[in-house]
Amino acid sequence: MTMQTADILFISHGGGPLPLLGDVGHQALVSCLQQLASQLNRPKAVIVFSAHWESTPVRVTTSANPSLLYDYYGFPPESYAIQYPCQGEPELAAQILSQLKAQGIDADAEPERGLDHGVFVPMKIMYPDADIPCVQVSLRQDLSVEFHLALGKALQGMDLSDVLVLGSGFSFHNMRGFFEPGNQTINQANHAFEQWLEAAMAEANEEAMQRWQQAPGGALSHPREEHLIPLFVCAGLAGRPYDQHLSVDVLGKQASQYLWLASEAPN
């Protein structure tokens, strides 16, 4: 089995910029992400797969100084003045592109697109000094679980020592559920799917992952699956059960974080 050189972390990133605005419904999530950042070895770079970028083919940001993409609507003016002036890492981006192509995955460089809120919101919480370079990799538009497991596996041959691979999505993403906290049908679906998902991740059961829509509460927890797909990229890259699972309340719903720690290098 290939040695896992990177720390791999899937997070539920919350609602738009709300985690950065002191929203009460995100306090537990902010504390959780800060705890995770303090627990992990400080990375020299972060590779992010965010739910908020889909393209065909897969694209990789190559800018040395990426801008921010305020890809949310209807929030207070300060939401659009958030700054996170991290650098990019063009050399790492080139290595990712080379590795993906070598593994038969069609991928292109993206020199212009900024980092979306699935990147800068959790990064600002975890690494507020913006002194760790970020590279963002898109999801493919078809959102195929099989493909995104393979996308993660395609990176297994890279030396990602001291790199954090971050899957930024949400283990529950039904907007109606967030706006209807008393909807017991959706609340029950949330709890059922979280239990099923933890079991699937604990077994690294890729066949089950590909059938997530048939899981208890699956379809109601994710009317569209883009927020779940980054988890499958992480699971594909790790190829084994998680090391740590953290569940927190976000806006009245259970939301999960999954962590796979890098392997110790042999002496």
Predicted regions and their residues:
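N-terminal short beta-loop-beta anion/metal-coordinating cradle
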Residues: M1-T5, S67, R113-V121
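Short, solvent-exposed loop/turn segments at secondary-structure junctions
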Residues: G15-P17, W53-S55, D142, S171-H173, ...
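Beta-strand elements within well-structured catalytic alpha/beta cores of enzymes
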Residues: D7-S12, A45-S50, V137, M158-S171, ...
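Long, well-ordered alpha-helical scaffolding segments within enzyme catalytic domains
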Residues: A28-Q39, E146-S161
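A short aromatic-anchored loop/beta-hairpin motif
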Residues: T2-L100, A107
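Surface-exposed, charge/polar-rich loops and edge strands
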Residues: Q95-S98, A102, I132-P133, L143, ...
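Internal, conserved structured core segments that host functional sites
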Residues: A93-F147
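Conserved phosphate-coordination/catalytic loops
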Residues: V24-A28, Q87, V145-L149, H222-E225
